[in-house]
Amino acid sequence: MKKIIYSTLIFTILISGMWACKKSFLESDPQTGVKFDANFFKDRKDFDGFMFGGYAEIQGAGSFFNLGIQQWIVDGGAMMQDIRDRSEQPYNLLSYATPTSTVSSAWQTCYKTIGRANLLLSKVQTSPGSLTDPEKNLLTGEAKFLRGFAFYSLAQRYGDAVIYLTPYDVADQAALSLARSPEAQVWAQVILDLKDAAAILPLNWDAGNTGRATKGAALAYLANAYMYVKDWPNAKKASQDLIALGKYSLLPNMRNLFSHLTENTAESIFEIQYKFVPGSKIAWSGQPNYGNFLNWFTGPLGAGAPYAIFGGQGTYPTARKLADSFDPNDKRRKELIKVPGESYAGETMAGQTYNIPLNITQKNSAFNAKWWTGAANQAGIEEWFWNQNIIVMRYAEFLLNYSEILFESGDVAGAYSNLNLVRARAGLANLVAQTNKEIFLTDLMKERRWELFWEPNIWYHYTRTGRAAKFLLDEYGLVMAPKFNKFPIPQGDIDLNPKLIQNTGY
């Protein structure tokens, strides 16, 4: 299928914050830092181009300073300690104690996305007749999904957040300098946006628009939002609406979920698109690439060509403790995690099989084969980039979420039935249904860890269910301060807006 590339090349990014901008012959949106001609929004192509910029923020393509969803994967896994084996590369929780760490980029990414959505919603309504009513409706649904997704991410990571719902005049500093709203109000806004989006968005897009938000994506995140506020009846309803679409299913082979050869499959609900662009560079040096960095980050240190990009960066090995926690018969362990002494035939190893030496430099670690597939086989700096998509929400995760929703709704049998669907794909026997909530949650969180390691949402299942501190103590002997259930607000934003109050403990 043809991929949609979330290109922002038609825009000039002039600022990184929301307040630092000035007037010129171009309009400037203070929320996004994007300048564009006052008459830019003339037709559907212009609206689509601006919309794609919202996806590009999530994608974080071609930039070390805003890795988008890639950095969110790393941050969550590092907090869990399942990324970077502690015996070789300890990752202290205090790395996240300062509001100048990498988690700042998530806050800024979300508000840039919200800014684009707000501006687009305003322009759609004031379009001078260049859009048909169905086009206006569709663009409205898509913009509300992106805004809802961004507010969802803010509430999930930071709790309280500033709720901006309209574009602002550049000179109106009072309108920009708002206080954070309580987390409950942020979730209420998420639900409003995603309900609207789910009612409008299509089941599928044509091949030329693969990757744009769909009805299924809106319903999946709507169900999750209801989980956060413990509205189990509505969470169940949204989940049932998604199942009724008849679109999604588990792939028989998990390897196909993490492959540049098989993307946008029946298991994918929301998937960020990447593409290798020959002759491109990283964002600060010419035309940016639209590949992701995870293959480069996860290749074993010193593996050599053609087994890893640049012979193996080894930035983020996987914790051996995670690898050892799997049932020996679990296909997920066999196919998606490798340890020294095992063999791996990645997709881009020139047809060769890599026998991982027992004395490899990172000999105490494991290696994540969800993203490590071998050398990218590109020239020079281009090899950093890889065109494998990143699935942000997939059906297996949805089924595990639905399992929790059903248990909380009193349907224990249904809860275990959905959990066991995921286990069956992994080659494991069914678990016997347990009515004790603590036993069920223990079963469920183990399954989430084994299924969703090195994916965007796993850490937040632990914080949402209040089990993060217990997990770190039981698995890694770490005492987690309560503040780490949420990330710190970027100090630069607090300096610009004194009404922003830092999260407790930071």
Q: Whereabouts are the PLM-identified features?
A:
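Conserved, well-structured interaction surfaces
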Residues: 44-52, 56-62, 83-158, 181-188, ...
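Long, intrinsically disordered, low-complexity segments
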Residues: 21-22, 55, 80, 110-113, ...
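Flexible, polar/acidic helix-loop-strand segments at domain edges
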Residues: 90, 321-394
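Bacterial Sec-dependent N-terminal signal peptides
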Residues: 4, 16-42, 190, 223, ...
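An aromatic- and glycine-enriched ligand-binding surface/loop that stacks and positions planar moieties
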Residues: 22-84, 165, 195-196, 212-356
